[in-house]
A protein has these predicted regions:
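…and closely analogous acidic/polar surface helices at protein-protein or active-site interfaces
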Residues: 27-44
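Short beta-strand segments at enzyme active-site cores
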Residues: 16-17, 49-56
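Active-site-adjacent betaalpha module
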Residues: 1-13, 39, 43-47, 58-174
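Short acidic, Gly/Ser-rich segments with clustered Asp/Glu that frequently serve as metal-coordination loops
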Residues: 21-26
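A short linear-motif detector with a strong N-terminal bias
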Residues: 30-31, 55, 143
């Protein structure tokens, strides 16, 4: 491992966005998203990366069984689409020296898009774990995470974040 990789690993957190049962089961085009998100979460945990769970404040006790917080992983209740505006997430990330974020969540066009843009705007390096994300509309999800779908779009997350898959989380953090 190079020194740069070690620094990336120790300054990286995983943000689990809106993985409440109701959201995962009703607002996802992809029935396999929970399994892949669980794999990505397990990889982050195994590597010792901090995991933050952000969900609407009314759903803080309604996590999908595969995606529930473990131990003392923080759960932040939000009142907006994104993870930053109505939580103390930024302060928590700064307190532990986080500079790089890996995001997964439902819905891609909601919490993932909003959180990615905010994180990018305030200086974080952002990686979107695209197969740990889903949207009610498969075409919208694809347009947001796959440059080849709509290459002229300024909406694509790939313009401001690196797209990865759940299998890559392990190598990114080791």
């Amino acid at each position: 491992m190079t020194m740069a990789n070690a620094a990336d690993r120790t300054h990286t957190a995983f943000l689990a966005l809106d993985y409440a049962t109701r959201i995962v089961e009703n607002y996802s085009h992809d029935p396999g998203v929970a399994d892949r998100a669980a794999y990505a979460l397990a990889s982050a945990r195994k590597a010792g990366a901090p995991v933050f769970h952000i969900v609407h404040e009314a759903m803080q006790d309604q996590f999908h069984p595969l995606l529930a917080p473990l131990g003392d992983e923080p759960v932040l209740g939000k009142r907006t689409l994104g993870a930053f505006a109505t939580t103390d997430l930024r302060e928590r990330l700064e307190a532990v020296g986080i500079r790089r974020l890996i995001l997964g969540g439902v819905a891609t066009s909601g919490t993932v898009l909003s959180t990615t843009r905010w994180a990018y705007d305030i200086g974080y390096e952002v990686l979107v774990c695209a197969d740990a994300c889903a949207d009610p509309d498969a075409q919208v999800h694809a347009a947001l995470v796959d440059e080849s779908v709509f290459p002229g779009s300024w909406l694509g997350l790939w313009r401001i974040a690196r797209m990865v898959d759940s299998n890559a989380v392990t190598s990114l953090l080791s």
